């Protein structure tokens, strides 16, 4: 009996050791699990009369749809109300109908920023219409197992800003759309995520961001920011760079900015922020200073201005074939910025890969459409257009860091 008992004990012990070894192996595998996600960011999706009078909106997206369909999430800034109860209208007071927004979704966009200076062009009625249009499309695509998201509008006045938590694969993404500029300061401004570009306004926004990050743990926090600054400027001011750093130190990982209608440079910047286990801690040492034991170095992506994705700003008489370097010509060229992030063992890695894809608005027989801006495409054009777009391509290459950027995986 003792012999049998010893055998049984040995078997149980062996089984326990085996289970422990398996559990340890699973834990080690989980620790080394690698998960990547790819975002695509565009410039402004605008709608001048030449755009919304198109017979087939899908043509806008045809040449880049494959790019937008083959990432994890594509982000677009809708720079107009979307209200079916109001007529279509162009600059300076925009409005489109839901089919224009639907075409963007069909074209591959998943996440929309609605906070900008044109969102309240049509007052409360325009905002109500936009909320309704998006809700209807969200419901429609929900039945097709397609999720779409937005930020920047309030259901009613007095609501606090709410970041949208997006779950994709095993990633948690916090998304917030904010504007610092308005065209209309009537009561409809209270339905937008508006942050005044003042010292106090920006201080309040930083506090809001810190609170959001603390209350909703996430892997990455993305801010769509419509900036209070002059249009058509190609250079980034030191003041703007400092503002973006403060946003990152408060908890933002990717700042995706708009308003100038032309592309400005982008960069990966290293900052320090107060964190605990990857999330913001926000504690001090009791003496009024930050406890440095929890300060972490982080790499953040700053897109200072993404220009226009589609518009009617460079079309017809506004195309200066004889002067490709004229300032307004830059409104027709932009990039799709792909950002690839990686987690290792559930922790965000320092490695970031930026892949800018040059695009241009090309006026075909009907209206401007988005084209991949390559020398191969330029070679297919008639001589007059070929000369113009080749010079535009050279100008874009000259001032933008258009080659892919890859940071080393460790600091």
Question: What is each residue range found by the language model?
Answer:
Residues 48-49, 82-85, 113, 119-131, ...:
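Active-site environment of divalent metal-dependent phosphoester hydrolases
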Residues 108-111, 238-335:
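Conserved beta-sheet core of the metallophosphoesterase superfamily
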Residues 71-83, 115-117, 209-234:
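Short acidic, glycine-rich surface-loop motifs adjacent to enzyme active sites
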Residues 52-54, 58-62, 165-224, 242:
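Binuclear metal-dependent hydrolase catalytic cores centered on His/Asp/Glu-rich metal-binding motifs
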Residues 85-105, 219-251:
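Active-site-proximal segments of metal-dependent phosphoesterases and phosphodiesterases across multiple
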């Amino acid at each position: 009996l003792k012999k049998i008992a010893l055998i049984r004990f040995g078997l149980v012990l062996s089984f326990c050791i085996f289970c422990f070894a398996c559990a340890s192996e699973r834990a080690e595998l989980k620790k080394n699990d690698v998960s990547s996600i790819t975002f695509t960011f565009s410039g402004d999706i605008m709608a001048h009369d030449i755009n919304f009078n198109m017979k087939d909106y899908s043509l806008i997206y045809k040449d880049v749809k494959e790019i937008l369909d083959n990432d994890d999430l594509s982000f677009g800034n809708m720079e107009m109300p979307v209200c079916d109860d109001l007529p279509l209208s162009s600059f300076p007071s925009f409005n489109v109908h839901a089919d224009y927004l639907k075409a963007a979704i069909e074209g591959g966009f998943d996440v929309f920023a609605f906070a900008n200076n044109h969102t309240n062009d049509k007052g409360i009625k325009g905002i109500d219409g936009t909320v309704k249009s998006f809700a209807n499309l969200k419901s429609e695509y929900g039945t097709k197992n397609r999720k779409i998201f937005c930020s920047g509008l309030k259901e009613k006045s007095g609501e606090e800003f709410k970041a949208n938590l997006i779950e994709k694969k095993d990633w948690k993404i916090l998304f917030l759309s904010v504007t610092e500029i308005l065209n209309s300061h009537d009561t409809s401004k209270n339905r937008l995520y508006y942050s005044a570009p003042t010292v106090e306004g920006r201080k309040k926004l930083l506090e809001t961001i810190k609170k959001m990050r603390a209350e909703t743990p996430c892997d990455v926090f993305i801010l769509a920011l419509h900036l209070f600054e002059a249009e058509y400027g190609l250079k980034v001011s030191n003041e703007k760079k400092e503002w973006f750093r403060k946003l990152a130190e408060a908890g933002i990982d990717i700042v995706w900015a708009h308003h100038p209608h032309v592309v400005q440079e982008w960069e990966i910047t290293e900052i320090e922020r107060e964190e605990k286990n990857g999330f913001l801690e926000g504690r001090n040492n009791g003496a009024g200073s930050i406890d440095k034991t929890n300060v972490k170095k982080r790499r953040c992506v700053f897109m200072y201005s993404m220009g226009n994705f589609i518009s009617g700003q460079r079309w017809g008489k506004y195309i200066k074939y004889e002067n490709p370097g004229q300032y307004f010509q830059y409104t027709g060229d932009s990039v799709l910025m792909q950002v690839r992030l990686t987690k290792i063992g559930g922790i965000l890695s320092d490695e970031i890969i930026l892949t800018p894809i040059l695009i241009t608005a090309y006026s075909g027989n009907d209206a401007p459409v988005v084209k991949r801006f390559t020398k191969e495409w330029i070679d297919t054009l008639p001589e007059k257009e070929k000369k113009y777009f080749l010079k535009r391509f050279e100008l874009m290459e000259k001032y933008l860091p258009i080659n892919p950027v890859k940071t080393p995986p460790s600091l």
